[in-house]
Amino acid sequence: MDDCIAAISSATGEAGIGIVRMTGEGCADVLDSVFKRANDKADFINRKMTYGHIVDDNEIVDEVLVCYMKAPHTYTREDVVEIYTHGGVVAVRKVLEVLLNNGARLAEAGEFTKRAFLNGRIDLSQAEAIIDMIKAKTDKAYSVSMKQLEGSVNRNIKQLRDKLLDMLSHVEYSINFTEDMQDELDNTPVLNEGKEVLDKLKKLSESANRGRIIRDGINTTIIGKPNVGKSSLLNALLKENRAIVTDIPGTTRDVIEEYIDLDGISLKINDTAGIRDTEDIVEKIGVEKSVSFISDSDLIIAIFDSSREFDDEDRKILDLIRDKKSIVLLNKIDLDGEFDVDENLEGIEVIHTSIKNNEGIEDLENKIIEMFNDGYIEANNDNIITNIRHRDIINKAIKSLESSLHDMEAGVPIDCFEVDLRNAWEILGEITGETVDDDVLNKIFSDFCIGK
């Protein structure tokens, strides 16, 4: 995998500039064949901008700046060329077409970063950190991704694998050179070190849920009957009109997703269809989807209308959020009240709101911060797992190590518990990419955009 590839690296749409990137063997030759310098200098200077034009059959395609970066000190550790074009859709597309017509191949999704991994510039956890940085919705998520790109996950896993390797060395030495294993072998040092590794693995695994929240946001679902103010709440939190607000019940028929940064905490908010009994097929599907979102939510905001009497549909909503992490809003307090709070919401903490008048919104925001800042993992914590793939691998390693330590304590023959010990060591290598198969690699890099 060293042929010349090319792709658009800048975002699609109107912009000041566009970027087309190439890497691989022969990319300088491809550039030479389509680039006409403004002066007569023959060679590109490493890491220096060169002004000129991209041409196709001597016809100018675009006025550009070109930067040629010579291997190995590049993103991919191969020769890299970046062409800075005028912004917009057409200019970058036409420049890319010229490159493809003159020897470059269109890059696959994530192929630039995949080459950086295969060429040893980054490990797999760092490659995954790059896509997390690109997708980060808050400063905190970005900071965690940056630490992982700098190698925080790699350092943690390498330290644990090194300890497991020391244990394996001790065990294998005993297998090969101890004549009477049962009488002479002392497993105590190996057992103690194994317990230390196990404890650290469990702490990493336990960090994954809060790490996921930092990375993906608090999965928050707004529920309630039609016209209680769900879409108005979304707009109030966003501080813009994203959702349609009308007096017509059932206006929201599908789930609207938006991200909000709340004092460094990211909320992924799902504005759902109003929950009620309905004969409308489309609305009914929306209601069913609303209910299904509840089970996967980290937080549920249930809204009730203080101007209406409590009814069976309200009771159904209360039942849905029972034993869930939730906040109850009693909205429309600016209207005459029909809702008996003491009778129907006894023992439930309620925030009184008039979303239309922006009353109670700050109280809601403060409540969310209070709920999720309690023991919240800070972005400068290196001992944090944000990737679900990493968590699953760590959990598999925990099972293997627990099995090995159990057999060790039970006096099982040494060559038996060595198998699970080695398995734990190999499993952890999947995080950094040292023991991962091609299918996993292809899946990870397919999540990247083309051009990264």
Curated annotation (Swiss-Prot):
One of its GO terms (molecular function) is GTP binding. One of its GO terms (biological process) is tRNA wobble uridine modification. Mg(2+) binds at residues 231, 252. SUPFAM superfamilies: P-loop containing nucleoside triphosphate hydrolases, TrmE connector domain. K(+) binds at residues 227, 246, 248, 251. One of its GO terms (cellular component) is cytosol. Binds 1 potassium ion per subunit. Its cofactor is K(+). Pfam families: MMR_HSR1 (PF01926), MnmE_helical (PF12631), TrmE_N (PF10396). (6S)-5-formyl-5,6,7,8-tetrahydrofolate binds at residues 21, 82, 121, 452. It is an enzyme of class 3 (hydrolase). It is found in: Cytoplasm. It comes from the Bacteria. Its EC number is 3.6.-.-. Residues 217-373 form the TrmE-type G domain. GTP binds at residues 227-232, 246-252, 271-274. The keyword Transmembrane does not apply. Keywords: Cytoplasm, GTP-binding, Hydrolase, Magnesium, Metal-binding, Nucleotide-binding, Potassium, tRNA processing. Exhibits a very high intrinsic GTPase hydrolysis rate. Involved in the addition of a carboxymethylaminomethyl (cmnm) group at the wobble position (U34) of certain tRNAs, forming tRNA-cmnm(5)s(2)U34. Homodimer. Heterotetramer of two MnmE and two MnmG subunits. Belongs to the TRAFAC class TrmE-Era-EngA-EngB-Septin-like GTPase superfamily. TrmE GTPase family. PANTHER family: TRNA MODIFICATION GTPASE GTPBP3 (PTHR42714), TRNA MODIFICATION GTPASE GTPBP3, MITOCHONDRIAL (PTHR42714:SF2). HAMAP family: GTPase_MnmE. This is tRNA modification GTPase MnmE. It comes from Finegoldia magna (strain ATCC 29328 / DSM 20472 / WAL 2508). The gene is mnmE.
